[in-house]
Amino acid sequence: YHVSQFGFDSRVVSAVGNDELGDEIMSVFKEKKLNTQIERVDYPTGTVQVTLDAEGVPCYEIKEGVAWDNIPFTDELKRLALNTRAVCFGSLAQRNEASRATINRFLDTMPEIDGQLKIFDINLRQDFYTKEVLRDSFQRCNVLKINDEELVTISRMFGYPGIDLQDKCWILLAKYNLKMLILTCGINGSYVFTPGVVSFQETPKVPVADTVGAGDSF
């Protein structure tokens, strides 16, 4: 959405079911004039139940066995990959082998060109991730977006305990030869790491209405 607002050619890649929710989603994209690469498949359209705790932090109940778990790698998607300069993908969409295989084929099909961006925006939700999926994604991306809680989990899984957050970020940046690592820390601000350089931005104090999607918009 944000990329299209800047006038760039962008696509939303996913899958929806042959149901009313799928129709509604396609209608919203059409209304907002957003380009899509969304397949209609014989699985129900995905839904998420979101509840907020006392501090406004969202908790998610994500339904399984849904359309976006089964995104096919079509000839049209292959053509898109061959002409893509930047892509953003996450870990949640890889919880099912079908969509994981499609995401990996898309990334591997993209031509290696200067300035190319493969952005991995980790979304550690429930138990929908494995060390193998995360390692493969680290190896395929060149930009990593992560929050402080996810960084602690990743450090525990990969054996980086007992060091501060910045040290963990430098380790990931070097180990996977990343162009950039973006760390968000909620009310404690955010960091951007590039080889040899780190910048910090404080979080502005604003009334919190709903934090759902705040990390994605960042």
Please provide the spans of the model-predicted regions.
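Conserved phosphate-binding/catalytic region of the ribokinase-like
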Residues: 158, 162-218
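Conserved beta-alpha-beta core of the PfkB/ribokinase-like small-molecule kinase fold
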Residues: 86, 90-167, 171
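Gly/Ala-rich phosphate-binding loop of Rossmann-like dinucleotide-binding domains
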Residues: 4-5
